[in-house]
Amino acid sequence: MKFTIYQESRIGKRASNQDRIAYCYSRDALLMVIADGMGGHLHGEVAAQIAVQFITQAFQREAQPLVADPVLFLSHVMTNAHHAILDYAFDKYLPEAPRTTVVACLIQNGQATTV
């Protein structure tokens, strides 16, 4: 699989940039993930980092070289990333869970699956 990646992140009006961007690939599949911590909420940048790391690590475990069921994979990995963020909040005794938006796209077999 051949591909070119270009990424750009802009801080906007906030004091810190909470964007996290990652991609990983196997011989036959490509995963791209974008997370943007929700400004105004506690630890949004941490939530974005946890989500990106969790999703990319799951892909690296599952893509052999393809993900067996892309829809199921993305559904499960998003739910599990959410639980990882909740676990972080619990472990750190935070008054509320950190928040982030996440978009993931898995490309394989000539098809893109997004969530």
Where are these regions (language model features)?
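PP2C/PPM-type serine/threonine phosphatase catalytic domain
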Residues: M1-V115
